[in-house]
């Protein structure tokens, strides 16, 4: 019975670790995506100030 109990505990620890890791990874991906969008907007804002860059990338620059 001791080996069965140890094996069961091992499986519970592995399962718990996997579930916690999966959920925390999802949260960090969401934060990374949000930060990435902010960086992208900042880069396009700089590009939109430059007339030549604005003309080449009109789809990213709002109409004035």
UniProtKB/Swiss-Prot annotation:
It comes from Conus leopardus. This is Alpha-conotoxin-like Lp1.8. Belongs to the conotoxin A superfamily. Alpha-conotoxins act on postsynaptic membranes, they bind to the nicotinic acetylcholine receptors (nAChR) and thus inhibit them. Has possibly a distinct nAChR binding mode from other alpha-conotoxins, due to a different three residue motif (Lys-Xaa-Pro instead of the conserved Ser-Xaa-Pro motif). Residues 22-41 form a propeptide. Residues 49-51 are annotated as: Lacks the Ser-Xaa-Pro motif that is crucial for potent interaction with nAChR. It is found in: Secreted. It comes from the Eukaryota. GO terms for cellular component: extracellular region; host cell postsynaptic membrane. The cysteine framework is I (CC-C-C). Alpha4/7 pattern. Disulfide bonds join 47-53, 48-61. It holds the Pfam family Toxin_8. Expressed by the venom duct. One of its GO terms (molecular function) is ion channel regulator activity. Keywords: Acetylcholine receptor inhibiting toxin, Disulfide bond, Ion channel impairing toxin, Neurotoxin, Postsynaptic neurotoxin, Secreted, Signal, Toxin. Residues 1-21 form the signal peptide.
